[in-house]
């Protein structure tokens, strides 16, 4: 029973995601589409606009057959670590192929780029180290190396976010899961970071911006998302009275930083090179989350990198809890349909890691972090409602 894996965040699920699912099913000729989705906190260090359970429902109604969770340990990381965790998890779940969106829609440039970098690994590492020593951020340092090696020319521009992620997927497949077939489809219309909605295919960034700025869903948003996403967004807002963004966590985050010792901050995952002092010193004068970010951000420390550190502060994720280099040791199912249930029944005897449907009565260290992350995510809603929303973690997967 062939399956195709998609590495996703669905923040929120939109028409472009539905197109991706449909195209992936066609190009892979798979009977089962498996989406591995980040939980409540995302790769760029952001809270999801609605929780993972409502996003799972939207994904299942949008064509995914199974949604499994990418553990927090891998989800809130740079592109390589994010990709490594996702690919290894999908491999353990038995997928035949992985399909991702790219600028060109062709695999050849990705294979060529991987071959070039692999053959120039020593030069790549040395150039990267030199660029970082010059004070460049990791993305800028890596892009400069790509330019030096001629990898920003032609069809594959590794300065583009989707191509960077796609390349990370291909690299992870080659190194950890060579039996998986990588596939790509060409992205439609909007760029990854476009902030305005132009038509029925729009970026998740533009959809979130429109929703959060207006605190409503206007005709442009309606046109860019499936009806089930509209229902899930509205359902979450009706229950909690909010859609999540970082500004709502600002008071709690600022309080955490101001009441932590320097040593405690030093122990937070991602805090290096004295950054703990800059984070704490700027907290006192910060008037908002965005204001605080502008005070901390430097050429070396990007917005995304700082956001990831802030998420780790919210979740109290420490350096000694960094399991990112470990192989995934469980697979958690968030939801599935009948096709997904058939896939699970067909393959379950072949899995070499436990399949988890709830964090109840589990003691795994990664799941302990997941539990903290969920509690941190819901911390900005009323206490009684927090308990109710958290109970979703203890229940079985969503079945449609």
From Swiss-Prot:
Transmembrane intervals: none
Superkingdom, natural source: Bacteria
Residue positions binding ATP: 7-20, 101, 162, 187
A GO term for molecular function: ligase activity, forming carbon-nitrogen bonds
GO cellular component, one term: cytoplasm
Chief localization: cytoplasm
Broad EC category: ligase
Pfam families in the record: HIGH_NTase1
Catalytic activity entry: cytidine(34) in elongator tRNA(Met) + acetate + ATP = N(4)-acetylcytidine(34) in elongator tRNA(Met) + AMP + diphosphate
Keyword Acetylation: no
Subcellular location: Cytoplasm
Family in the record: Belongs to the TmcAL family.
Protein's recorded name: tRNA(Met) cytidine acetate ligase
């Amino acid at each position: 029973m062939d399956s195709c894996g998609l590495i996703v965040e669905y923040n929120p699920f939109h028409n472009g995601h539905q197109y991706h699912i449909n195209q992936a099913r066609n190009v892979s000729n798979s009977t089962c589409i498996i989406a591995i989705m980040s939980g409540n906190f995302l790769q760029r260090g952001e809270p999801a606009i609605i929780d993972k359970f409502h996003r799972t429902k939207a994904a299942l109604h949008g064509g995914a057959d199974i949604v499994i969770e990418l553990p927090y340990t891998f989800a809130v990381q740079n592109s390589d670590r994010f990709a490594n965790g996702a690919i290894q998890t999908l491999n353990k779940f038995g997928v035949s192929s992985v399909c991702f969106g790219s600028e060109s829609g062709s695999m050849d440039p990705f294979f060529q780029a991987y071959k070039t970098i692999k053959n120039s690994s020593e030069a790549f590492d040395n150039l990267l180290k030199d660029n970082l020593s010059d004070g460049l951020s990791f993305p800028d340092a890596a892009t400069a190396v790509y330019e030096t090696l001629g990898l920003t020319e032609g069809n594959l521009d590794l300065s583009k976010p989707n191509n960077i992620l796609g390349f990370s997927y291909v690299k992870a497949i080659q190194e950890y899961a060579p039996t998986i077939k990588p596939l790509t489809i060409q992205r439609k219309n909007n760029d990854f970071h476009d902030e305005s909605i132009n038509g029925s295919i729009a970026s998740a960034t533009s959809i979130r911006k429109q929703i959060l700025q207006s605190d409503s869903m206007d005709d442009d948003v309606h046109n860019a998302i499936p009806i089930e996403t509209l229902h899930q967004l509205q359902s979450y807002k009706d229950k909690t009275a909010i859609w999540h963004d970082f500004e709502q966590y600002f008071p709690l985050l600022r309080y955490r930083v101001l009441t932590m010792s320097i040593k405690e901050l030093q122990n937070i995952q991602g805090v290096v090179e004295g950054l703990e002092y800059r984070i704490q010193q700027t907290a006192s004068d910060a008037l908002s989350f965005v204001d605080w970010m502008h005070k901390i951000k430097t050429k070396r420390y990007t917005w995304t990198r700082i956001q990831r550190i802030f998420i780790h502060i919210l979740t109290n994720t420490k350096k000694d809890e960094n399991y990112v280099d470990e192989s995934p040791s469980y697979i958690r199912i968030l939801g599935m349909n009948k096709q997904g249930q058939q896939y699970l029944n067909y393959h379950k005897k072949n899995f070499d890691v436990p399949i988890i449907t709830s964090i109840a009565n589990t003691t795994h260290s990664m799941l302990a972090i997941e539990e903290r992350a969920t509690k941190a995510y819901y911390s900005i809603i009323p206490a009684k409602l927090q308990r109710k929303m958290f109970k979703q973690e203890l229940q079985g997967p969503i079945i449609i």
